[in-house]
UniProtKB/Swiss-Prot annotation:
Zinc in keyword set: yes
Keywords: Hydrolase, Metal-binding, Metalloprotease, Protease, Zinc
The keyword Hydrolase is assigned to this record: yes
Species the sequence originates in: Geobacillus sp. (strain WCH70)
InterPro entries cross-referenced by the UniProt entry: MPN, RadC_JAB, RuvA_2-like, UPF0758, UPF0758_CS, UPF0758_N
BP terms from Gene Ontology: proteolysis
A Pfam family assignment: RadC
Protein name: UPF0758 protein GWCH70_2550
Length: 226
């Protein structure tokens, strides 16, 4: 017999709990169980969802898993994997829709909020430049490179070339630490100082360099490096 949601006690069923208390009240594995709908002959859908998350160490790695990696889990077939991937992609698109307008960045918190959900789960370091107009509105965003950050790779020319092309008044640079710890490294500080100096020469101010961790961030401006 395959375990289904209806086999779970009513007061513990994720769907009923969502209806009564809202989706924010559910744990990650409960939301996942609603997508999966059925378990296996050996375990309930809640147990299956919990095992799936444990395999991927939570949402961080599941977010970037391939259909082959997901279907390698016992009890997860193509249909279930497709449902999971579709839900993840919808989440990504909704996150992007939130900022399709001219988002205004007036503080490090504003900048971190703008990129946090896109960058906190990335498995590699991404260095991103955010270009602003004179009203501190975002006019463009560009990934400059992907990989370990060092001063020889992050060339100011690539950062400021786009700023000139977009007639940007200022820029904010952002990169993530896949470890989840946003503590700046010596390389982070060196890159920041180099970009800030180039910005002063060109006349396009580097407002900040943000390091994104897992729901945490560090502003190198607040640390006194910009």
């Amino acid at each position: 017999m395959t375990f289904m949601i209806r086999d779970v006690p009513k007061d513990a069923r994720p769907r009923e709990r969502l209806l009564s208390s809202g989706p924010e009240s559910l744990a990650d594995h409960e939301l996942l169980a609603i997508l999966l709908r059925t378990g296996t002959k050996e375990e309930s859908v809640l147990q299956l969802a919990h095992r799936l998350l444990k395999h991927f160490e939570g949402l961080r790695l599941l977010k970037d898993a391939t259909i082959e990696e997901i279907t390698s889990i016992k009890g997860i077939g193509t249909t279930k994997a497709v449902q999971i991937l579709a839900a993840i992609e919808l989440g990504r698109r909704i996150s992007r829709l939130s900022y399709n307008g001219r988002y205004v960045i007036r503080s490090p918190e504003d900048g971190a909020k703008y990129v946090m959900e896109d960058m906190r789960f990335l498995s590699q370091e991404h260095f991103v430049a955010i270009y602003l107009n004179t009203k501190n509105q975002v006019i463009h965003r560009k990934t400059i490179f992907i990989g370990s950050l060092n001063a020889s790779i992050v060339h100011p020319r690539e950062v400021f070339k786009e700023a000139i092309k977009r007639s940007a008044a200022s820029i904010i640079c952002v990169h993530n630490h896949p470890s989840g710890d946003p503590t700046p490294s010596r390389e982070d500080i060196d890159v920041t100082k180099r970009l800030a100096e180039c910005g002063r020469i060109i006349g396009i101010e580097l407002l900040d360099h943000l390091i994104i961790g897992d729901q945490k961030f560090v502003s190198l401006k607040e640390k006194g490096y910009v």
